[in-house]
Amino acid sequence: MAGELSIGAELPTSPLAMEYVNDFDLMKFDVKKEPLGRNDRSGRHCTRLQPAGSVSSTPISTPCSSVPSSPSFSPTEQKTHLEDLYWMANSYQQMNPEALNLTPEDAVEALIGSHQVSQQLQGFESFRAHHHHHHHHQHHHHQYPAVTHEDLAGSGHPHHHHHHHHHASPTPSTSSSSSQQLQTSHQQHPPSSSVEDRFSDDQLVSMSVRELNRHLRGFTKDEVIRLKQKRRTLKNRGYAQSCRYKRVQQKHHLENEKTQLIQQVEQLKQEVTRLARERDAYKLKCEKLASNGFREAGSTSDNPSSPEFFM
């Protein structure tokens, strides 16, 4: 009964320790009865071996009740070395080191050093409670950033003077750092007007899309969209101007060609008129020659002195 009371007194209430103990399956070990004369000694040993308790539906079992007894704990001290080796092999088989990834030496050291593990767990729980208390005060200070150091000092918490002073100071420094970041961002990214003025119209029109994207790295999306819209407007304006210029050039070319054709037509008309006059002249001349020929033929036929007349 005294051993059970001592076990209950040394059980930690930490959930982490409870979860640590629940990972071990203690129901697969056999129960070995110990002599009555060694109950007190084995009870004290069990209090050292069990680091934490577990509240579960399984019956409470201790490592001492499931692990075979050590040769030093047996009632008769006349155990041979062969029996010692048998106890070590039997305990190694029952503890299932494959599941725990332990060697026989690690299993013995784990059973012996379990009391130190419980002390470390208790120290961790105390550190965890202190950290939670510090985090609670820090969260409380961030909820009320306008409270000054003098107000906190006068509120009746002098033992947290250093913590509140340490957390109250970052408020102006945070604002100053944010303002410096904004100034740096403004220096790195000038306003939209300066971004548009950074490139001339000729540069925007003559620059390729890949080169423009390389120059626009680091600017905001709105500035990039605005600059690309300006470039598209300039491109469309250039296209319209080039088309208008081409149309004007084509119009001038057609007008010149028309003038030349009109001149050629006039020249051809004049040539036709000249040829018509020449034709008429040649026609009159031909008619004259024809009439003269008929007259000469008639005069020769009426002459009696012709040699044919006397024949």
Swiss-Prot record:
<feature type="domain" description="bZIP">
    <location>
        <begin position="226"/>
        <end position="289"/>
    </location>
</feature>
<keyword id="KW-0238">DNA-binding</keyword>
<dbReference type="GO" id="GO:0005634">
    <property type="term" value="C:nucleus"/>
</dbReference>
<feature type="compositionally biased region" description="Low complexity">
    <location>
        <begin position="169"/>
        <end position="194"/>
    </location>
</feature>
<feature type="region of interest" description="Leucine-zipper">
    <location>
        <begin position="254"/>
        <end position="275"/>
    </location>
</feature>
<dbReference type="GO" id="GO:0000981">
    <property type="term" value="F:DNA-binding transcription factor activity, RNA polymerase II-specific"/>
</dbReference>
<dbReference type="Pfam" id="PF08383">
    <property type="entry name" value="Maf_N"/>
</dbReference>
<dbReference type="InterPro" id="IPR024874">
    <property type="entry name" value="Transcription_factor_Maf_fam"/>
</dbReference>
<dbReference type="InterPro" id="IPR046347">
    <property type="entry name" value="bZIP_sf"/>
</dbReference>
<dbReference type="Pfam" id="PF03131">
    <property type="entry name" value="bZIP_Maf"/>
</dbReference>
<dbReference type="GO" id="GO:0045637">
    <property type="term" value="P:regulation of myeloid cell differentiation"/>
</dbReference>
<keyword id="KW-0539">Nucleus</keyword>
<dbReference type="GO" id="GO:0000978">
    <property type="term" value="F:RNA polymerase II cis-regulatory region sequence-specific DNA binding"/>
</dbReference>
<comment type="subunit">
    <text>Homodimer or heterodimer with other bHLH-Zip transcription factors. Binds DNA as a homodimer or a heterodimer. Interacts with ETS1.</text>
</comment>
<protein>
    <recommendedName>
        <fullName>Transcription factor MafB</fullName>
    </recommendedName>
</protein>
<keyword id="KW-0805">Transcription regulation</keyword>
<feature type="region of interest" description="Disordered">
    <location>
        <begin position="150"/>
        <end position="199"/>
    </location>
</feature>
<comment type="function">
    <text>Acts as a transcriptional activator or repressor. Plays a pivotal role in regulating lineage-specific hematopoiesis by repressing ETS1-mediated transcription of erythroid-specific genes in myeloid cells. Binds DNA via its basic region-leucine zipper domain.</text>
</comment>
<keyword id="KW-0010">Activator</keyword>
<dbReference type="InterPro" id="IPR008917">
    <property type="entry name" value="TF_DNA-bd_sf"/>
</dbReference>
<comment type="similarity">
    <text>Belongs to the bZIP family. Maf subfamily.</text>
</comment>
<dbReference type="InterPro" id="IPR004827">
    <property type="entry name" value="bZIP"/>
</dbReference>
<feature type="compositionally biased region" description="Low complexity">
    <location>
        <begin position="54"/>
        <end position="76"/>
    </location>
</feature>
<feature type="region of interest" description="Basic motif">
    <location>
        <begin position="226"/>
        <end position="251"/>
    </location>
</feature>
<keyword id="KW-0678">Repressor</keyword>
<feature type="compositionally biased region" description="Basic residues">
    <location>
        <begin position="157"/>
        <end position="168"/>
    </location>
</feature>
<dbReference type="InterPro" id="IPR004826">
    <property type="entry name" value="bZIP_Maf"/>
</dbReference>
<dbReference type="InterPro" id="IPR013592">
    <property type="entry name" value="Maf_TF_N"/>
</dbReference>
<feature type="region of interest" description="Disordered">
    <location>
        <begin position="35"/>
        <end position="78"/>
    </location>
</feature>
<dbReference type="GO" id="GO:0006355">
    <property type="term" value="P:regulation of DNA-templated transcription"/>
</dbReference>
<keyword id="KW-0804">Transcription</keyword>
